[in-house]
Amino acid sequence: MIIVRNSFIARPGQAGKLAAQLKEMGNAASLRNVRVMTDLTGDFNHVIMEHDVESASEFEQLMMQYASDPKAREAAKGYTDLWTTGHRELFRIV
């Protein structure tokens, strides 16, 4: 099992809106075990979205599916306007 963690620094005042949109995006893409979190400590305006995949190949399939799924693309519309920077990490559960 792999956890996919997408980490964003939202524009000031946009963290709540970004968190809500990431939840919608996860549901639209039928991601497994989607979790959206906002900061209590650390960097300000930090929003994290995590979900599970069985393997790196499943992750790759999801990325290709996302690129061609109109429902997922519609849910993501405008979300890049809500954050300034971000990164993705994949973790293997041991």
For each predicted feature, which ranges?
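Short S/T/G/P-rich N-terminal loop/turn motif that feeds into the first structured element of a domain
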Residues: 1-94
